[in-house]
Amino acid sequence: MSEMTPREIVSELDKHIIGQDKAKRAVAIALRNRWRRMQLDETLRYEVTPKNILMIGPTGVGKTEIARRLAKLANAPFIKVEATKFTEVGYVGKEVDSIIRDLTDAAVKMVRLQSIEQNRYRAEELAEERILDVLIPPAKNNWGQTETQVEPSAARQAFRKKLREGQLDDKEIEIDVATTPVGVEIMAPPGMEEMTNQLQSMFQNLAGQKHKSRKLKIKDAFKLLIEEEASKLVNPEELKQQAIDSVEQHGIVFIDEIDKICKRGQTSGPDVSREGVQRDLLPLVEGCTVSTKHGMVKTDHILFIASGAFQVASPSDLIPELQGRLPIRVELQALTTKDFERILTEPSASLTEQYKALMETEGMIISFTDDGISKIAESAWQVNESTENIGARRLHTVLERLIEDISFEASERRGQSVDIDADYVKKHLDELVADEDLSRFIL
């Protein structure tokens, strides 16, 4: 779980996302409150429930990017889902309970990797001994049993030294490694994923774990044996319990496109993929117990962050009960020309840096001048205003069109350099930007 302060979280988000300070502050406070809650005594800790967030803003302003970056910072079970993928219970499609099942699977994987990392040093020692046993088989007594030696032989120590120095990396050895059972692929209708997973687990357990002799280079065998030995040191039951605790206390669910499940106008018949989904989400957000293949998971303290553009619908179109369970509202602002300029230059892996690095692989140097960047930003903003406003995603389209000729000819122009200035941008984009019909289809 992350112990970063709100200011540190915002500072980290600033490296990748331009503007949207209110949204950054809201998620930073929510993340820090997870840590604060764990410092309370158990009685009060149970009473403190997370304050779920609803992020409202046009497409392409950074809602999903905030979620992506938050997942890396949280160091906690995190899942991002699309609200449009779900249908009401009893109808064809995914049920909302699968959100918690997927979150628990992610937590098990995360805890497993952490446990393997904690046991890595011991696993490396055991893997080293297994390789040395192949290189210098231990002495056996008259009954064919391996004798335990108090002190390793001089030859074994010499080989250990060579192994650690990498002198034996390319030598081939034959070792016995565990083989994973071949998975049985079961086709099931949507909504039956849990049953499918249980059947697959059952067939894998029936097959059991077998060992197979393989011929590998020592460096490859060492990696394989480390993973195998580390897995043996992990207790599966403890791992599952840790994962469930982690989900219940620190889990974060990000629900994107929640505006797409708002009811629009008067419709006849059941609305299974809109209002029905909202009703099914209610118990999850409020707190209930969900059955997963790893055990029962309580959702009372899972943090839910929902986001939507709300261009056609409005937050008040959500059912009142769900509105009440998303108490913190954050509005993200539409991007301006200045924001576009900052997006092109400020993030640690900005679009301009990406294109420079790609062209350098061909031995070609491209550089973006300040007036060139201003012109690119202005062109993207103009196209957004005259056609559909897709926010920062427009920059991808504009830049790809701008660099198209350079990308095509880069392999033939090794050693050359190109400055992308305002004149270059005008030459390649002005005609498209000015013609609304062309920009609608090309940009």
From Swiss-Prot:
GO terms for biological process: protein unfolding; proteolysis involved in protein catabolic process. It comes from the Bacteria. One of its GO terms (molecular function) is peptidase activity. GO terms for cellular component: HslUV protease complex. ATP binds at residues 18, 60-65, 256, 321, 393. It is found in: Cytoplasm. It holds the Pfam family AAA. ATPase subunit of a proteasome-like degradation complex; this subunit has chaperone activity. The binding of ATP and its subsequent hydrolysis by HslU are essential for unfolding of protein substrates subsequently hydrolyzed by HslV. HslU recognizes the N-terminal part of its protein substrates and unfolds these before they are guided to HslV for hydrolysis. Belongs to the ClpX chaperone family. HslU subfamily. A double ring-shaped homohexamer of HslV is capped on each side by a ring-shaped HslU homohexamer. The assembly of the HslU/HslV complex is dependent on binding of ATP. This is ATP-dependent protease ATPase subunit HslU. It comes from Photorhabdus laumondii subsp. laumondii (strain DSM 15139 / CIP 105565 / TT01) (Photorhabdus luminescens subsp. laumondii).
